[in-house]
């Protein structure tokens, strides 16, 4: 997700201010009109941040009165392990004023973010669990350490989760909702991914605790700001429950490149949450997608049952690991099941194995490296400059 490209009247002002990291927008139909994410420089104090917000509010109100603008101004503030930012709905004059504040690092357009699943294939076999626990293909038995993620909290940042589904009985709670007022999974995507990372039947980390964080609507879309707000909530919740270092976060979603999105997931990882993300489903280089392009997180591409790159899967040097993503059976809202394909399905396999490793004492900082070290070098035609390592849980099988 690129940052805003201001019209020419702003360029002189931008050049005059401290050469901040102000990124130019690469265009695209996913831009949310007049909606922006403003990221502050490192080291900005609470007092400076609050003063900036007050100044922005006053400027916005003045410009609104002058021009009859219908923009709503500042919306939400974020503080993810010291990374301070906010989003809002501003006119161009207010954005010009924001850019002239030397406490501001950069500004981005807010953009649409979507889930990374593809199609439903009825009655497809479930094969992913057996594949990630064996060096050789074709084994349906899932072999795993008995700790199975016990004591680890996994945040499913998605379309919500059906918290009444028997797959999650006694291990799940609703967290927060940044997209609407409906605390259910009207899409099914979030329930499916949760079933893979921690479901009793279809899951990898079968004893992990689960938190539903809804950032995408029933239609499968949301905003970068809404995703960041959800991540901010996860870090705050984990800190309040003394779960940092014992938590994982799954992001089976994405959009075009966003430095703000990448910064947010990086700070969450640095705070002590293992972050797994989907590479994306456009058969393109994942470095142009966020949060997949954040180097600090574990980016998952999708493989097929015969150890090939899924035709839809993004690729590239930013990909850390392949994981099963084609025709994956998992939970569906209402107590049922469904089969989906996508890098959305690969990411929760990685998240679940990562959570299991955390339960075994591997540190958050080392989980992704460990996965890459022990992964099976079996993926055929993985893509240009892309790893051929397939996720493996270290079962010894």
UniProtKB/Swiss-Prot annotation:
Q: Which residues form the active site?
A: 158 (charge relay system), 189 (charge relay system), 344 (charge relay system)
Annotated CDD domains = Peptidases_S8_PCSK9_ProteinaseK_like (cd04077)
Pfam families noted in UniProt: Inhibitor_I9, Peptidase_S8
Enzymatic class:
hydrolase
Q: Which N-terminal stretch is annotated as signal sequence? A: 1-19
The cross-references to InterPro entries, in alphabetical order and at most eight, read: PCSK9_ProteinaseK-like, Peptidase_S8/S53_dom, Peptidase_S8/S53_dom_sf, Peptidase_S8_Ser-AS, Peptidase_S8_subtilisin-like, Peptidase_S8_subtilisin-rel, S8pro/Inhibitor_I9, S8pro/Inhibitor_I9_sf
Q: What is its EC number?
A: 3.4.21.-
**Does the record bear Cell wall biogenesis/degradation in its keywords?**
no
Spell out the subcellular localization from the entry.
Secreted
What positions belong to the pro-peptide in this record?
Answer: 20-116
Provide this UniProt record's keywords sorted from A to Z.
Glycoprotein, Hydrolase, Protease, Secreted, Serine protease, Signal, Virulence, Zymogen
The residues that carry sugar chains are: 250, 393
Q: Which GO terms describe its molecular function?
A: serine-type endopeptidase activity
**Where do the Peptidase S8 domain residues begin and end?**
126-397
Biological process GO annotation list? proteolysis
The segment(s) forming the Inhibitor I9 domain are 35-116
* GO annotation, cellular component aspect: extracellular region
Q: Write down the SUPFAM superfamilies for this protein, in alphabetical order.
A: Protease propeptides/inhibitors, Subtilisin-like
Q: Which domain of life is it from?
A: Eukaryota
Q: Is Zinc found in the keyword set?
A: no
Q: Which Gene3D superfamilies match?
A: Peptidase S8 propeptide/proteinase inhibitor I9 (3.30.70.80), Peptidase S8/S53 domain (3.40.50.200)
What family does the Swiss-Prot or TrEMBL record give for this protein? Belongs to the peptidase S8 family.
- Matching PANTHER family: CEREVISIN-RELATED (PTHR43806:SF11), PEPTIDASE S8 (PTHR43806)
- Function summary: Secreted subtilisin-like serine protease with keratinolytic activity that contributes to pathogenicity.
Annotated protein name in UniProt:
Subtilisin-like protease 3
Q: Please report the organism this UniProt entry assigns to the protein.
A: Trichophyton equinum
Q: Give the encoding gene's name.
A: SUB3
């Amino acid at each position: 997700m690129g940052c805003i490209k201001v019209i020419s009247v702003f360029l002189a002002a931008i050049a005059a201010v401290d050469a901040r990291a102000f990124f130019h927008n690469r265009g695209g139909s996913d831009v949310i009109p007049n909606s922006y994410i403003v990221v502050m420089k490192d080291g900005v104090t609470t007092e400076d941040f609050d003063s900036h917000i007050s100044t922005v509010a006053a400027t916005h109100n003045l410009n609104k009165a002058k021009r009859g603008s219908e923009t709503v101004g500042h919306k939400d503030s974020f503080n993810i392990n010291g990374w301070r930012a906010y989003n809002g709905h501003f006119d161009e004059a207010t954005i010009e004023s924001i850019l002239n504040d030397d406490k501001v690092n950069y500004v981005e357009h807010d953009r649409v973010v979507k889930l990374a699943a593809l199609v439903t294939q009825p009655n497809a076999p479930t094969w992913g669990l057996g594949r990630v626990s064996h060096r050789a293909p074709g084994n349906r038995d899932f072999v795993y350490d008995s700790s199975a993620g016990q004591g680890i909290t996994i945040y499913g940042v998605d379309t919500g989760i059906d918290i009444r589904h028997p797959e999650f009985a006694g291990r799940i709670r609703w967290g927060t909702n940044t997209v609407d007022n409906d605390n259910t999974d009207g899409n099914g995507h979030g329930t499916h991914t949760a079933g893979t990372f921690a479901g009793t039947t279809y899951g990898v980390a079968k004893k992990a605790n689960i938190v539903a964080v809804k950032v995408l609507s029933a239609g499968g879309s949301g905003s970068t700001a809404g995703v960041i707000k959800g991540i901010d909530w996860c870090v705050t919740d984990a800190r309040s429950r003394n779960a940092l270092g014992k938590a994982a976060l799954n992001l089976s979603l994405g959009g075009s490149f966003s430095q703000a999105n990448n910064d947010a997931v990086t700070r969450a990882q640095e705070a002590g949450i293992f972050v797994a993300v989907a590479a994306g489903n456009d058969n393109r280089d994942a470095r142009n997608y966020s949060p997949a392009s954040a180097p600090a997180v574990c980016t998952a591409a999708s493989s097929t049952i015969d150890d090939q790159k899924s035709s839809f899967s993004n690729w590239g040097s930013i990909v850390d690991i392949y994981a099963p993503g084609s025709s994956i059976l998992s939970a569906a809202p209402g107590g049922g099941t469904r089969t989906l394909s996508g890098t959305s399905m690969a990411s929760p396999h990685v998240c679940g194995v990562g959570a299991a490793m955390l339960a075994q004492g591997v540190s958050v900082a080392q989980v992704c490296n460990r996965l890459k070290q022990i992964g099976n070098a079996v993926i055929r035609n993985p893509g240009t400059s892309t790893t051929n390592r397939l996720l493996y849980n270290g079962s010894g099988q």
